[in-house]
Structures are given as structure tokens and as C-alpha cells.
């Protein structure tokens, strides 16, 4: 076994942020719920680092506006820390997020109920793509159980299997899910699901590119880009439950495209907040 190294970075977070609120959100995130922790003031998670697909553990703490990210692993720990900042949306300058509340009272209420929430849940576009495949035509609870079983049987001490490992697995899964997971793994190894690259693209262009991966349709591709790459300003146009939430909160006849004009440049964040409130109220299915 390679020697484990530890690396710590401090990052100044611009705009509203609460580690406690984000952690609570992730703990209730059905596709990949965050497990329990021994440290009540920290968020800890285990994942594959995109640049080399090694396993890393990250522990994040907050002191006012500063995030301390400590990563442990045997790979590229600078990349591991950067990835942790991305999947917790700590690398987003959110000083303009409060301005969205000034333009939209519905989002103002959402911000008040979820103070400092930054979207999180998937460690990478690769993991989001794998979830998109697993959850097709299955109940969320059932898909989450399958995902957890894959991690338990084939993962690396709590981390989802790397693409190289996933390609070797002959999984007994419904339909063509095994075939599609192999396609996702191959795409990840080819760089098609690279988080930094998808972040650098215009969101609709990134979604179109991801749809080139076998097994990923419009809904799955949006999930990969908006939640996997954690793009802050994209619009999930294939989320039926979000459309229902728009009708409930803005009134009949209002559309997502109409109300989201006021959300720029944080359309993803606004959508996640509305879905989180719907889940909290018990009127929606688990978030995905």
C-alpha cells in the first residue's frame, strides 16, 4: 500500500456560506447521503480524485468566511482539495447571490430558510453520471440501495469505484444499466466527464456534450453538468418536480424560463433551493 499523505489548504469563501446548512442538505441527499461523523463541526467525505482516480478523504471545517480543507490520500492532493472546493461550491464567488433575493421574493424566502446553503451532493460528474444511469426507471430508494451495495462490494473503503474498476465489473443490474455504467466509466477515462472542463463550457453546450455518452439522456446530462460539475448558472429544464414547485410558489401559468430570468447568474442554486424546500415540506420525492 502506498504511503498516505495529508495536505491542508485554507480557502476564503466569497458570499454566503454555512457548512452546517450544506452538511444538513447533503445528509438528506437521497442519491448519495453523507454518512455520520465523529466531529460535529466538520464535514467529512470519501471520493475518487478526477485527475488520477485515487481515493481521497476530505474533512472541511469553517471559521467565519474561511474554509479549511484537509485531504488525505496517496495521489494528487492539490487536485483533491480543488475538487472538494468544487463539489462543495466553495470556489464560487457568491457575493451576488443576495442580489437574487432582492429581485425575487420567493428566492429571498428560500435563502432565509436555508441560510448559507451551497449546492453539494455529488463528488464529480462521473459519480453523477453513474447515479443518472442507476436511477433510470427505478425508485430513488432502490437506486440508492444499489449504489451503496456497489460501493460496499467494489468501492475503495467508502469511495465509489474508479472508472478503471467499474469497467471490470459484471454487475447484475436491471435492463442495460451495466452496459451504460461501462460507457460512463469509459467516458470518464476519456475526459468527457472532467469537472473543470465542463465548468469552463457554456452550460447548454456542456449538456449537449454529455448527452454523447451512451445511456445519458437530457435529464441525466443536466444532472451531470449542473450537480456533478456544480455549474452555478444552468437551468434544469427536464426536472418535472421543479416545474411543480414553480407552479406552487409562483402561481399557475408561470414558467421556469420566465421566473428564472431573475435568478442569473445563480440559476442552478435557485433551483436547488426550491427543490430542497419541496423535499423539506414533504411534497416532493427525494432530491436527485
Regions found by a protein language model. Name each.
Residues 1-288:
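HhH-family (HhH-GPD) DNA N-glycosylase catalytic core used in base-excision repair
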Amino acid at each position: 500500500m502506498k504511503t498516505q499523505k495529508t495536505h491542508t489548504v485554507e480557502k476564503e469563501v466569497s458570499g454566503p456560506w454555512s457548512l452546517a446548512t450544506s452538511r444538513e442538505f447533503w445528509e438528506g441527499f437521497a442519491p448519495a447521503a453523507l454518512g455520520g461523523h465523529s466531529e460535529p463541526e466538520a464535514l467529512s467525505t470519501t471520493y475518487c480524485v478526477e485527475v488520477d482516480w485515487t481515493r481521497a478523504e476530505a474533512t472541511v471545517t469553517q471559521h467565519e468566511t474561511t474554509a479549511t480543507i484537509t485531504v488525505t490520500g496517496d495521489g494528487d492532493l492539490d487536485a483533491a482539495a480543488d475538487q472538494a472546493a468544487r463539489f462543495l461550491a466553495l470556489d464560487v464567488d457568491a457575493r451576488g447571490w443576495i442580489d437574487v433575493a432582492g429581485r425575487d421574493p420567493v428566492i429571498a424566502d428560500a435563502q432565509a430558510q436555508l441560510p448559507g446553503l451551497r449546492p453539494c451532493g455529488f463528488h464529480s460528474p462521473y459519480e453523477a453520471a453513474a447515479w443518472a444511469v442507476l436511477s433510470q426507471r427505478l425508485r430513488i430508494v432502490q437506486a440508492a440501495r444499489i449504489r451503496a451495495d456497489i460501493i460496499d462490494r467494489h468501492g475503495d473503503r467508502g469511495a465509489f469505484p474508479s472508472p478503471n474498476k467499474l469497467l471490470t465489473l459484471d454487475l447484475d443490474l436491471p435492463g442495460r444499466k451495466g452496459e451504460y455504467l461501462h460507457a460512463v466509466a469509459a467516458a470518464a477515462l476519456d475526459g468527457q466527464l472532467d469537472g473543470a472542463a465542463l465548468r469552463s463550457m457554456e452550460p447548454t453546450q456542456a449538456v449537449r456534450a454529455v448527452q454523447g455518452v451512451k445511456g445519458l439522456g437530457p435529464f441525466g446530462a443536466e444532472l451531470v453538468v449542473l450537480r456533478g460539475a456544480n455549474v452555478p448558472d444552468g437551468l434544469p429544464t427536464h426536472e418535472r418536480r421543479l416545474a411543480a414547485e414553480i407552479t406552487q410558489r409562483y402561481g399557475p401559468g408561470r414558467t421556469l424560463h420566465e421566473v428564472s430570468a431573475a435568478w442569473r447568474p445563480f440559476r442552478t442554486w435557485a433551483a436547488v433551493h426550491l427543490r430542497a424546500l419541496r423535499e423539506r415540506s414533504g411534497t416532493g420525492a427525494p432530491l436527485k
